[in-house]
Amino acid sequence: MRTPLKIVLVGLPGSGKTTFGKALAKQLNFAFIDLDQVIEQETGNTISQIFEQEGEGRFRELESIYLKKVLEGIEGFILSTGGGTPCFNDNMELINEKGVSVYLDVSLEEIIRRLGKDAFGKRPMFTNLGDGEAILKLKNLLAARENYYMQAKIKLSGDDISTEQLLSELMVFFRN
């Protein structure tokens, strides 16, 4: 079995990209890379600081720069992207050109359950929003982003499924 060398996870915030990515990286003995962490390390600012001080437009620009840098660098990794990464600056096209994209498709209800009330406020896109506003924003994000996510080479349903089951499903794709 030849496993693709660059696996890129896409999906909404709370879809499990980081959790699943770390488990997959461990199973495949690959590096795990979180794009947000790369941006923070390279810029010396948190994602929240970039949003607050420079705006979302600048963040998306940085996101594209570092996505390209990661995808053109090492091989043998699992990359967890930000929820909006595929939707800007031809990023999804680049992801599909340089790696194997995997969309973790999780229902809004499950994402809301996973994130809980407190986690929304820790994410820049949801800062200063009440629960109802955060849920509405999440629904709007899915509507705006789903077309990009659906361009992924592999789609996995992440509702009511364990990380181990997701890993098994993904390995079936690689064997075929």
How does the language model describe each region?
Residues L35-N96, K117:
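ATP-dependent small-molecule kinase phosphotransfer cores
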Residues L12:
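P-loop (Walker A) phosphate-binding loop of NTP-binding proteins
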